[in-house]
Amino acid sequence: MFEYIRSHEGIRDILEIGTAVGYSAIQMASLRWDMTIDTVEINPDMYEQAVNNIMHAGLQDRVHAYLQDAYQFETKKIYDLIFIDAAKSQYRKYMEHFFKNARKGTVFFFDNLQFHGIVDCPELSQNRSTVQLTRKILKFREYLKTDSRFETAFHLDVGDGIAIAVVK
């Protein structure tokens, strides 16, 4: 994702769903001085660590962290890139919820679409809830292939599998 952002200079405003400890937001903001990132995290402990990490990196003027459920986060801002890295089973709902914050050319970036290889090989897991989750991820991948609002490229061999969906 970082290389994608680096090579697309038009990406300036980013929304990240799933801050965790702020690593991705910090890395994105460090790529170029002209980017701003809004990042949303529901877990208070993760959020607090992220805020500390963002401040330690000196990026608090360009990385804005919000502690709330992503479905409660409302903004009229239009983003160049929307990075969804939260609850994998909710990817489609997040995409629909934040589609109003997109325009033609906005990039939706989805991570972890292989889920450690289990999506394509469910026999790798004996855990029922993991198998159910990977079925939902597979269903989302299949849906994304047919969603005519996007031009989508899958790179399942990159990291843990990614999709880059550009709004038509």
Positions of PLM-derived features:
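S-adenosylmethionine/decaboxylated-SAM
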Residues: 1-168
